[in-house]
Structure formats: structure tokens, C-alpha cells
């Protein structure tokens, strides 16, 4: 008997198939999604001070650059304190902990804005959920690859 096709107003669901991927490729996907999260947040937050900026930084004692993402207000404070110290305006150099403590009010505002955007924007909430899935997947693959037997 012939099969009768009926048209359905229901949209076709999207199915994504992911095969085995290298750890490098998974890390690349995490970074791309992270960039998407920050771009969306930066476009929708209250001020440029709250923007999240990513770049490469080489830690003291190593030549290996690492990706570091931080809010603009923290980057600006670090630059200001470093300039003050180099010019002799202060005798104390600030540690990362000192900078974080001094920026507590700004971090509270940043967290509030992220939460507010997540609750008010389904798109942002979905981007964050995708990011969480990717980071969990990366962590699981990394743990499996480097597990001790």
C-alpha cells in the first residue's frame, strides 16, 4: 500500500551529531562559545566598564601565554596601580587579591548584571547553557585522556 504523507505544521527538530573530537578542537569550541557569551554580555550591559575583555598573558617565570578574561574595570585598576608603582607614587605593588578586594563593589554589580540579563534574555540563557555543556564535555574528555590508571 502506498504511504500517505501528511504535512505537519510542526517544525523539524535540530539534531546535532558530534563524533570524536580532539582535545584541541573541543578547547577551541569552548573559547568560541566563551567569546559569544562575552560579546552578547558586552553588547547588553550598562557600561563599557563592565565589558569582559580576553587576551593572552604570560605569567612570571614562564614563556607560555594563557588566555585571561577579566572585566574592564579590573584591567583598568591593574594598569593604574602598575603605573603608580612605576612612577613612585606608591611603594606597594598590588597583588591580584588586593585588586579583587578593592573591586568588590564592581564585581557585585557585574554579577547582578549577568544574573539580570540571564533572567531577562532567553537567548543569553541559552548561550550560557551551551557554554556550560561545552565546558563539561571538555573537562570530561580531558579527565579521560589524562586519567591515571
Where do the language-model regions lie?
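Sec-dependent signal peptide cleavage junction
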Residues: 1-16
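Extracytoplasmic
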Residues: 12, 47-51, 64-66
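N-terminal secretion/transport leader regions
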Residues: 12-21, 69
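Primary mode marks residue(s) on the alpha4-beta5-alpha5 output face of response regulator receiver
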Residues: 21-32, 86-87, 91-149
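N-terminal post-signal-peptidase region of extra-cytosolic proteins
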Residues: 34-41, 51-57
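Short coil/loop "hinge" linkers that interrupt or connect long alpha-helical coiled-coils or helical hairpins
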Residues: 56-71
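Extracellular/mature segments of secreted proteins
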Residues: 61-65, 76-81
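Amphipathic, hydrophobic secondary-structure cores in small proteins
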Residues: 72-79, 90
Amino acid at each position: 500500500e502506498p504511504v500517505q504523507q501528511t504535512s505537519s505544521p510542526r517544525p523539524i527538530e535540530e539534531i546535532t551529531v558530534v563524533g570524536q573530537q580532539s582535545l584541541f578542537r573541543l578547547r577551541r569550541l569552548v573559547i568560541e562559545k566563551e567569546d559569544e557569551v562575552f560579546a552578547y554580555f558586552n553588547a547588553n550591559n550598562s557600561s563599557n566598564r563592565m565589558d569582559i575583555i580576553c587576551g593572552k598573558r604570560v605569567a612570571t617565570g614562564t614563556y607560555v601565554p594563557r588566555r585571561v578574561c577579566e572585566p574592564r574595570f579590573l584591567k583598568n585598576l591593574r594598569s593604574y596601580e602598575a603605573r603608580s608603582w612605576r612612577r613612585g607614587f606608591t611603594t606597594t605593588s598590588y597583588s591580584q587579591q588586593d585588586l579583587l578586594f578593592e573591586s568588590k563593589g564592581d564585581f557585585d554589580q557585574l554579577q547582578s548584571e549577568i544574573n539580570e540579563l540571564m533572567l531577562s534574555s532567553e537567548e543569553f540563557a541559552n548561550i550560557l547553557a551551551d557554554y556550560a555543556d561545552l565546558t563539561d564535555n571538555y573537562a570530561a574528555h580531558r579527565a579521560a585522556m589524562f586519567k591515571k590508571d
